[in-house]
Amino acid sequence: PDCFTISYNKNRGLIIQFNVKLTILGGSKASAIVEKDYRRWYQEMFAPSVMAGIIKISDIAGYRSNQVYIRNSKHTPLSPEAVRDAMPVLFNLLKNEPDAWTRAVLGHFIFTFIHPYMDGNGRMGRFLMNAMLASGGYRWTIISKDIIDDYMAAIEKASVDGDIREFATLLSGIVRNNK
């Protein structure tokens, strides 16, 4: 990609991020906004990849219709049929959890555990996490490349062993150090 494409994609992401934060901080319930808009966010995020011919438009039209496997992971995401049952349960959990921090950690983890799309689940999980964080007054948080291995190991442990403590502790440190 040329500099214009990179700049365009970065600015597009910033605009989406700004609109999400503005809506959530404006008093709207974060879980309702995410449930209503996350599919559109996904399509907006990946539209440039469709336009570039990297992925097919059908790949961003809805939940995946094939089984997906994660490279270098022992976790096998839910079947396509189970995804359709699990996503409403996730959004119900987010609606009923009063604590923004808990919504952020569980929302991110459960979304990536379900893995509803063929690609981009980690990015969408982090986007969902940030929407929940913003609803609690936390700053937008980036998982930097220098800790990506720790992040991936923590999410792998949570997904495979069912132990989310390391993942929650890692996210807590990242959010706390995000000034």
Q: PLM features: residue spans?
A:
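FIC/Doc superfamily catalytic core
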Residues: 1-179
